[in-house]
């Protein structure tokens, strides 16, 4: 995609807010179903003030439901120059990098206007908390190690829904699987430089998009439908699906990391910056940055992502990685934080299982037992929360 008039953003964002706080966004005009696009944001380059706008860099829509491309690789699957993803000059981080990176940038694809997946009267199992037996697993690891999974399905969502693995879970008495991160991710630069990837997946870059590397069938419909089929299969077996979600940080890492999406769209809005030096990021996560959930726009994005996974993908709950980060204000943990208030107020999200990992590496970071309750109940709710 190339740069267009900024007023075109309303065509892309007619169902959700623009991701840009300060500055303006450029987006393609009149996008149809299946169109591939990226965003460019105009604004000041002033890292010392927290601004990192660089219109030479094509940016991923944070509301993308499918990510086209892979960080570190070109469209043909060949390794790309990682410095092309940097917003700053690789030799002097105080200056912007003026090289256009559209050829290798991560892009979004416009989803179909109407869902076509047949859920076949899918119903949420709604297992009461007191009877929940939760089994944490990794999509790739669990399906590669089980001897009953055909080789073609190993490492995939389809493999996780295979009868051999479903029967194994039932035999163990599992009522709820907790999937380690399945959001589309960006493997950290330092790992790629060593020929490695982030196996565990705690480096999300698109909160509404499933990770395509776990799909047997490529393409938007293939990835989405394969994940939905997995959920439908587990529900038929009476097993809930909970997602391990990473909203405490993004895969853009620290100030020397890539500019893939949020950093280039509105760095000062999306991230918690060091008060005395806004060119640097507060790092309560140990992963280089922290999302700023005191900002209404950031809470909107996270809530939209959660609602998408419940309404469209039929998941039954979430486990929040490093949950205290989601409730920090001025550096302190706040049980009345805006994000928790948004969860309690949301008719859909207050019905599902919500699990908090109770620590981060910030001050007073261990908060076990100090997370507020939500209005989750099994006595008055219907069997399906998808409407």
Label for each model-derived stretch:
Residues 105, 314, 329-330, 334-379, ...:
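Conserved alpha/beta catalytic core and glycan-binding cleft of carbohydrate-active enzymes
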Residues 23-26, 115-122, 161-165, 338-342:
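Short alpha-helical segments and helix-capping/turn motifs at coil-helix boundaries
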Residues 90-91, 101, 138-314, 319-345:
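Substrate-binding/active-site clefts of carbohydrate-active enzymes
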Residues 20-22, 29-136, 145-152:
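The feature marks proteins involved in alpha-glucan
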Residues 28-31, 102, 124-128, 169, ...:
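A general structural signal for short secondary-structure junctions and capping/turn motifs
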Residues 1-16, 378, 383-387:
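Single conserved hydrophobic/aromatic residue that forms the stacking wall/gate
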């Amino acid at each position: 995609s190339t740069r267009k008039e900024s007023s075109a953003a309303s065509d892309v964002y007619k169902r959700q807010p623009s991701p840009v706080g300060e500055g303006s966004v450029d987006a393609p005009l009149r996008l149809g179903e299946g169109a591939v696009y990226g965003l460019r944001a105009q604004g000041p380059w002033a890292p010392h003030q927290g601004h990192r706008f660089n219109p030479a860099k094509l940016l991923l829509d944070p509301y993308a439901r499918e990510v086209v491309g892979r960080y570190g690789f070109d469209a043909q699957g060949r390794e790309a120059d990682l410095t092309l993803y940097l917003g700053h000059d690789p030799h002097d981080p105080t200056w912007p990098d003026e090289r256009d990176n559209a050829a290798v940038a991560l892009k979004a694809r416009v989803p179909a206007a109407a869902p076509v997946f047949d859920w076949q009267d899918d119903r949420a199992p709604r297992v009461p908390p007191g009877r929940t037996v939760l089994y944490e697993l990794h999509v790739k690891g669990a399906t590669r190690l089980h001897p009953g999974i055909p080789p073609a399905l190993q490492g995939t969502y389809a493999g996780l829904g295979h009868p051999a693995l479903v029967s194994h879970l039932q035999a163990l008495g599992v009522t709820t699987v907790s999937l380690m991160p399945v959001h589309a991710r960006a493997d950290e630069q330092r790992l790629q430089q060593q020929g490695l990837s982030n196996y565990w997946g705690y480096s999300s870059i698109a909160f509404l998009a499933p990770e395509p590397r776990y799909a047997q069938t490529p393409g938007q419909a293939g990835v989405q439908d394969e994940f939905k089929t997995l959920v439908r299969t587990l529900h038929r077996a009476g097993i809930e699906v909970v997602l391990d979600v990473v909203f405490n940080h993004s895969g853009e890492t620290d100030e020397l990391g890539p500019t893939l999406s949020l950093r280039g769209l509105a760095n000062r809005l999306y991230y918690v910056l060091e008060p005395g030096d806004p060119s640097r990021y507060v790092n309560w996560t140990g992963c280089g940055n922290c999302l700023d959930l005191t900002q209404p726009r950031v809470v909107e994005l996270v809530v939209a992502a959660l609602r998408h996974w419940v309404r469209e993908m039929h998941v039954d709950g979430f486990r929040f990685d490093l949950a205290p980060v989601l409730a920090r204000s001025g550096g302190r943990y706040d049980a009345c934080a805006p994000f928790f208030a948004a969860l309690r107020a949301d008719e859909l999200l207050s019905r599902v299982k919500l699990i908090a990992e109770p620590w981060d590496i910030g001050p007073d970071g261990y908060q076990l037992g100090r997370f507020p309750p939500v209005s989750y109940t099994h006595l008055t709710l219907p069997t399906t929360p998808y409407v």
